[in-house]
């Protein structure tokens, strides 16, 4: 006898909440952080899944743009400079991360139009 009773099914392999939701980010860890962080007395079952999905999407978006910046600079490795270029050149990400300083990121190349040399109109 297996000890499961009459009609009980065999216990299936444990499946993580991340794999159930089709995510790479850890739903269980996000849930633990939400509970520990004093954001509320109770945390619903869907909240950590949603938050993990949002974090995964934002990370993928930034990495995609940073990868493009690295390829434009003929590099195969993403460095903080590429992250800075990716975030600051994207309008929405720049608005979201406006107050964030990326270490070793540098600045965007920008010359004010007033400082540029004036074009002389030589007519031949």
From Swiss-Prot:
InterPro entries: Histone-fold, Histone_H2A, Histone_H2A/H2B/H3, Histone_H2A_C, Histone_H2A_CS. One of its GO terms (molecular function) is protein heterodimerization activity. The modification N5-methylglutamine is found at residue 104. GO terms for cellular component: nucleosome; nucleus. The modification Phosphoserine is found at residue 2. It is found in: Nucleus; Chromosome. The nucleosome is a histone octamer containing two molecules each of H2A, H2B, H3 and H4 assembled in one H3-H4 heterotetramer and two H2A-H2B heterodimers. The octamer wraps approximately 147 bp of DNA. It comes from Psammechinus miliaris. Monoubiquitination of Lys-119 gives a specific tag for epigenetic transcriptional repression. Phosphorylation of Ser-2 directly represses transcription. Core component of nucleosome. Nucleosomes wrap and compact DNA into chromatin, limiting DNA accessibility to the cellular machineries which require DNA as a template. Histones thereby play a central role in transcription regulation, DNA repair, DNA replication and chromosomal stability. DNA accessibility is regulated via a complex set of post-translational modifications of histones, also called histone code, and nucleosome remodeling. Keywords: Acetylation, Chromosome, DNA-binding, Isopeptide bond, Methylation, Nucleosome core, Nucleus, Phosphoprotein, Ubl conjugation. It holds the Pfam family Histone. This is Late histone H2A.2.1. Belongs to the histone H2A family. Residues 1-21 are annotated as: Disordered. There is a cross-link at residue 119 (Glycyl lysine isopeptide (Lys-Gly) (interchain with G-Cter in ubiquitin)). The modification N-acetylserine is found at residue 2.
